[in-house]
């Protein structure tokens, strides 16, 4: 591969799917001159992906981890309420429930959950959330049904280094994000497919640029790039494979690859399905090599935390909008990527109805 091309994808920035709005921080009085952040919910509908009526509601919660009590205190009043020390913000994806009830009541039910947590470790530092108590309406959620969820601490806890390895820890839900989407449209690409490589393959990557609304004085800007129009983040996602040769064994030209990619009729959006995520929809025909990267309805979900945990955690509390999306064709092995130029293809739609909205569990 001796040259490079980029396919720029068109998107409508006015659509809700091109934005992810943050939760506004609202303080409420709780007496004695104290205030706390008011619980809030956010609802996003993704019916623009398909016409299916078999909708599910994906539930993502954001809240805070507290340490309950003090192990070092051995004497005290029995009537005293144990002290709750705020340690860090966190995210817990519960899974989905059928879209058959009142969504506001569903969000309210999440606030009544009793969840404890503790640290663990495998090849990565883990946070294990245990569901002690949950309302009936949430029982079909995967995490509630399993009674626990073990997640990567770096991806799901704002400051995992602040979480001790002992003591009683409690996760308190404060923000609930509900995304209504046809169930079959939420498709997370198998890790095995993402690791496939070969000299006879081209990798298709999505270069996504996201504008982030952030106070210039916030420490969050240290993790973002700056332009005349504000701050932004770049993401690089692996979205598929294509063969370097055709059925006759002849080398496939970049022009032919571009035509194949444009026939996919790709569109891209932002949503909160498995945490802040980039959603990709291919409305055109998909080749055999592309099949593992999309659901039967042509959709794929890319949690931003897998590409950049730091950017994903910024989007927990900041409004984000798609700025640009490009498809980049790269060589099929990492060694070849290192020594060859890339190829950009430019024509992908941005679903403007996809937004991550304002919600700020821990705005700095």
Curated annotation (Swiss-Prot):
Motif FPIV motif, chain ranges: 23-26
GO MF annotation terms: identical protein binding; structural constituent of virion
Lineage top rank: taxon: Viruses
Annotated compartments: Virion
Lineage: Viruses, Riboviria, Orthornavirae, Negarnaviricota, Haploviricotina
Alphabetical UniProt keywords: Host-virus interaction, Viral budding, Viral budding via the host ESCRT complexes, Viral envelope protein, Viral matrix protein, Viral release from host cell, Virion
Keyword Disulfide bond: no
Protein name per the record: Matrix protein
Gene Ontology CC terms, in alphabetical order: viral envelope
GO biological process, one term: viral budding via host ESCRT complex
UniProt comment concerning the protein's domains: Late-budding domains (L domains) are short sequence motifs essential for viral particle budding. They recruit proteins of the host ESCRT machinery (Endosomal Sorting Complex Required for Transport) or ESCRT-associated proteins. The matrix protein contains one L domain: a FPIV motif.
Family: Belongs to the morbillivirus/respirovirus/rubulavirus M protein family.
């Amino acid at each position: 591969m001796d040259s490079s091309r980029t396919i720029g994808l068109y998107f409508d920035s006015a659509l809700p799917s091109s934005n992810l709005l943050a939760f506004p921080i609202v303080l409420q009085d709780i007496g004695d001159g104290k205030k706390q952040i008011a619980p809030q919910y956010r609802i996003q509908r993704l019916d623009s992906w398909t016409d299916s009526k078999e909708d599910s509601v994906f539930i993502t919660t954001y809240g805070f981890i507290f340490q309950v009590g003090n192990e070092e205190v051995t004497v005290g009043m029995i009537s005293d309420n144990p002290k709750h020390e705020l340690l860090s913000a966190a995210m817990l994806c519960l899974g989905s429930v059928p879209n058959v009830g009142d969504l506001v009541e569903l969000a309210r039910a999440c606030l009544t959950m009793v969840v404890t947590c503790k640290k663990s470790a495998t090849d990565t530092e883990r946070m294990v959330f245990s569901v002690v108590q949950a309302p009936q309406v949430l029982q079909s959620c995967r995490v509630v049904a399993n009674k626990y969820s073990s997640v990567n601490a770096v991806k799901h806890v704002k400051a995992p280094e602040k979480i001790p390895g002992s003591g009683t820890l409690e996760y308190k839900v404060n923000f609930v994000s509900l995304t209504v989407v046809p169930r079959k449209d939420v498709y997370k690409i198998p890790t095995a497919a993402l690791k496939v490589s070969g000299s006879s393959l081209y990798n298709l990557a999505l270069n996504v640029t996201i504008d982030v609304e952030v106070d210039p004085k916030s420490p969050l800007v240290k993790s973002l790039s700056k332009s005349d129009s504000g701050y932004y983040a770049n993401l690089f996602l692996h979205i598929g494979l294509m063969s370097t040769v055709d059925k006759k064994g002849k080398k496939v030209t970049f022009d032919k690859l571009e035509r194949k990619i444009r026939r996919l009729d790709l569109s891209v959006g932002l949503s909160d399905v498995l945490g802040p995520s980039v959603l990709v929809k291919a409305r055109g025909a998909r080749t055999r090599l592309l099949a593992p990267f999309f659901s039967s309805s042509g959709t794929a979900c890319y949690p931003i935390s897998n590409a950049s945990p730091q950017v994903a955690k910024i989007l927990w509390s900041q409004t984000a909008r798609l700025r640009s999306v490009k498809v980049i064709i790269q060589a099929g092995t990492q060694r070849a990527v290192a020594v060859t130029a890339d190829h950009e293809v430019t024509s992908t739609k941005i679903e403007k109805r996809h937004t991550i909205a304002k919600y700020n569990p821990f705005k700095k």
